[in-house]
């Protein structure tokens, strides 16, 4: 059941009941909960608004600051804000913090009303069509009740759309200070047009609706400034730093990531000439991120659970139970900034807070120094002027062949030697690689005296899902004065990927549950089992296998009660059987239903999906009871799902195999294949008697093509030559190749297609092609298809280097890639 399907079943008329059955690991059986439906309006401000106390300090009286977190802009946002402002007015707060971090947006008119609540005059936002046509300005109205205290708006990369409208209005009308990260950058307007479908897609009238979402306009913030692609740049940018160590692994992040995902990072994003590209924040404050004890605060962009990048972390550091009183650096920082503010105007507020900002920077810098000192790094600061240091940097692997196996730890060693005459302070190296597991990792050396060398060993976890690839790692060297030129070498490392699993499966629908007549067919009102046996036909083991059965899209009347199973490892050639259970309701409409089956190794990312269609049979007689045994009298006798020559073949039995008999229907006899299932065999293919022995050979109904691809991992030139072979027990319909390069910021390119036109035998095909490449690492995906649903995939990562061995310059995203060769006939 998908989330949407669950929502559809939960929704209903107010004051009606819905039963929810919950299964827990800690409680045997299933527990029933009856819920009375009601009209639910999630609060826009959550947790509730509160007042933060600021104690008195040197030269500063005690103060109160109001705080609220606007989660989204919904129909009740303005109303919830009105209640919060009433609280702040009663408490006589000196400033207000509006937290829009993680707010994806929402209703345009609510964003306008929230902005209007703080701003007395001016254009809050403009909606402008193509070429400036159909312009609509939303202006502030002076209600006489707008708060006049200083205002701070907290934003991050996940503040989007309506959030950016509010932040842009506050900033550009000089009403308050914006603090945090640059926002997402979505300033476009989409309109959804309903289109009637020419063909039915489901059983309900709603299933036949199609929609076209068309971009028709854009939002402009005050001053006609577009946020599209650039977002709102904060007045005070805050950068979280990380210094952590667990065992031999450390996580150092002393500068912000360049890979924060925003609108401009998506292929084919829109741009506008009024967007302020290159705008910088007025101030920058870095702070040490301090996770709560026991929290896993590290995970890199590759998805490795053990390595979290700073930008992926929850800055609050609080659990859900603590949300009513949550706090973090940004909230504390904004609270103290507003408490000492002498003006509510944005520019005056920031310019008048220089001393406060310097104090915060010094305190956070001290925290970083102390954290690094615990790791044995001298992070003391040196003089700000004088002669620049001269340094040499060497990167080297800790293994002789620089080969790393996927799923293990990679160890890289950096050595910096001071070959100059002056000491170098706060020396660190930042790695640069197309592979996110290496990219932006930092090696920290600290103070290095003249003639001294210092080393740092970086340990990273290479995910088990990594493909075989060669990665080039470069490093930029920084000192207290910024980036420095340093003689050194780049490093090539080879990752050896694991052999991948591949899944085949056979299934059988068995009507032996509640309300079933055991004729092997599915009738309305029956509860049935779908027995799915999965075989790993690949070379490598599956590390964590999941099998999921879902209802067909928009389909009602099929209720799945057991639809998800897990298995840990599935070795090559090993099989595993899953027993799904579902019910066909008596009111099901139609003569056929569809089920979506997915089998996946969630660790390695290999999967198989298929759509299974099952016909509804008319009500018929139950099989006649029969006892005894039967011996198979022909070679590879087909055993079927039901009693009929056109029924699905679920397996074959060799001549001489003996089964126990349990029923008879027409010209077929039901035999017990094993303790968990039965099947039907033609009575003409058996004779009575015999001692039970032998077993069923499964009939694999879905086996994706076997695919082998040969390609180098490093090339010099504009393309890579690949060749391969695909084979299947039924059909290899075609082969196609896609290529993608993360840094090129272009859509995935379909670079090659070859249909199988072999005369006679279409169960195999050879192919070869020249695939275009871009600078750096290219993900080349080769697909071999049996059908639209059943296909196999092999991924090759190819590093494109310049003739001198360096990474060639990355072209502009607008540049065209090398032309792909024509498909081979």
Cite the ranges covered by each PLM segment:
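Surface-exposed, short loops/turns at beta-strand junctions within beta-sandwich domains
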Residues: 14, 466-468, 586-590, 770-777
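Long, low-complexity serine/threonine/glycine- and acidic-rich segments characteristic of extracellular
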Residues: 446-462, 568-571, 575, 703-720, ...
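SH3/SH3-like beta-barrel superfamily modules
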Residues: 651-682
């Amino acid at each position: 059941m998908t989330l949407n399907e669950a929502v559809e079943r939960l929704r209903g008329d107010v004051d009606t009941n819905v039963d929810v059955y919950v299964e827990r690991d800690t409680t045997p059986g299933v527990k029933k909960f009856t819920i009375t439906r009601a009209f639910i309006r999630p609060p826009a401000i959550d947790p509730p608004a509160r007042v933060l106390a600021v104690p008195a300090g040197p030269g500063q009286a005690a103060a109160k600051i109001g705080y609220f977190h606007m989660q989204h802009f919904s129909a009740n946002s303005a109303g919830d804000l009105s209640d919060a402002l009433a609280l702040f007015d009663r408490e006589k707060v000196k400033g207000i913090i509006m937290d829009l971090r993680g707010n994806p947006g929402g209703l345009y008119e609510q964003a306008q009303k929230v902005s209007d609540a703080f701003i007395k005059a001016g254009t809050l936002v403009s909606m402008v069509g193509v070429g400036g046509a159909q312009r609509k300005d939303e202006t502030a109205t002076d209600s006489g009740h707008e708060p006049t205290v200083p205002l701070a708006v907290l934003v991050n990369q996940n503040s989007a759309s309506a959030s950016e409208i509010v932040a842009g209005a506050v900033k550009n009308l000089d009403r308050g200070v914006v603090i945090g990260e640059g926002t997402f950058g979505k300033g476009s307007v989409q309109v959804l047009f309903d289109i009637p479908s020419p063909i039915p897609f489901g059983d309900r009238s709603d299933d036949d609706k199609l929609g076209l979402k068309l971009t028709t306009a854009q939002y402009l913030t005050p001053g006609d400034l577009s946020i599209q692609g650039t977002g709102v740049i904060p007045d005070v940018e805050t950068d979280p730093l990380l210094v952590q160590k667990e065992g031999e692994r450390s996580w150092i992040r002393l500068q912000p990531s360049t890979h924060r995902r925003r609108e401009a990072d998506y292929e084919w994003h829109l741009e506008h000439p009024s967007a302020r590209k290159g705008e910088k924040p007025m101030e920058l404050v870095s702070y040490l991120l301090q996770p709560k004890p026991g929290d896993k605060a590290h995970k890199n962009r590759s998805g490795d659970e053990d390595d979290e990048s700073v930008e992926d972390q929850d800055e609050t550091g609080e659990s859900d139970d603590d949300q009513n009183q949550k706090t973090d650096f940004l909230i504390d920082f904004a609270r103290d900034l507003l408490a000492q503010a002498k003006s509510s105007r944005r520019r005056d507020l920031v310019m008048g807070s220089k001393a406060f900002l310097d104090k915060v920077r010094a305190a956070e810098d001290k925290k970083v120094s102390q954290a690094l000192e615990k790791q044995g790094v001298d992070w003391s600061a040196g003089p700000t002027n004088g002669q620049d240091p001269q340094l040499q940097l060497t990167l080297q692997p800790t293994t002789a062949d620089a080969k790393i196996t996927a799923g293990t730890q990679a160890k890289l060693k950096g050595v910096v030697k001071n070959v100059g005459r002056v000491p170098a302070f706060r020396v660190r190296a930042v790695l640069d690689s197309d592979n996110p597991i290496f990219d932006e990792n930092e090696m920290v050396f600290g103070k290095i005296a003249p003639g001294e060398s210092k080393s740092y060993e970086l340990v990273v976890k290479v995910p088990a899902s990594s493909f075989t690839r060669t990665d080039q790692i470069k490093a930029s060297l920084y000192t207290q004065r910024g980036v420095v030129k340093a003689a050194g070498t780049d490093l090539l490392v080879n990752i050896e990927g694991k052999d991948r699993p591949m899944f085949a499966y056979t299934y059988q629908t068995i009507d032996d549950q509640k309300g079933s007549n055991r004729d092997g067919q599915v009738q309305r009102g029956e509860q049935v089992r779908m027995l799915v046996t999965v075989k790993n036909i690949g070379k490598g083991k599956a590390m964590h296998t999941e099998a999921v059965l879902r209802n067909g899209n928009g389909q009602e009347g099929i209720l799945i009660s057991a639809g998800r199973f897990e298995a840990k490892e599935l070795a090559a050639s090993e099989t595993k059987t899953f027993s799904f259970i579902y019910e066909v309701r008596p009111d099901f409409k139609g003569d056929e239903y569809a089920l979506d089956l997915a089998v996946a190794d969630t660790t390695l990312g290999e999967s198989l999906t298929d759509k299974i269609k099952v016909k509804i049979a008319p009500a018929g007689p139950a099989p006649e009871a029969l006892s005894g045994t039967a011996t198979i009298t022909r070679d590879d006798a087909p055993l079927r799902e039901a009693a009929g020559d056109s029924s699905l073949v679920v397996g074959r039995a060799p001549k001489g195999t003996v089964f126990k008999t349990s029923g008879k229907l027409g010209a077929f006899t039901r035999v017990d294949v094993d303790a968990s299932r039965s099947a039907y065999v033609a009575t003409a293919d058996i004779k009575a008697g015999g001692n039970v022995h032998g077993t069923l050979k499964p009939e694999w109904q879905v086996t994706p093509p076997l695919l082998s691809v040969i390609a180098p991992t490093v090339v010099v030139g504009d393309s890579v030559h690949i060749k391969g072979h695909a084979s299947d027990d039924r059909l290899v319909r075609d082969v196609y190749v896609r290529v993608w390069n993360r840094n090129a910021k272009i859509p995935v390119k379909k670079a090659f297609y070859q249909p199988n036109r072999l005369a006679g035998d279409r169960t195999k095909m050879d192919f070869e092609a020249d695939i275009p490449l871009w600078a750096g690492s290219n993900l080349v995906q080769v697909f071999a298809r049996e059908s639209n649903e059943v296909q196999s995939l092999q991924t090759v990562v190819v590093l494109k280097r310049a003739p001198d061995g360096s990474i060639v310059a990355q072209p502009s995203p607008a540049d065209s890639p090398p032309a792909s060769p024509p498909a081979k006939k």
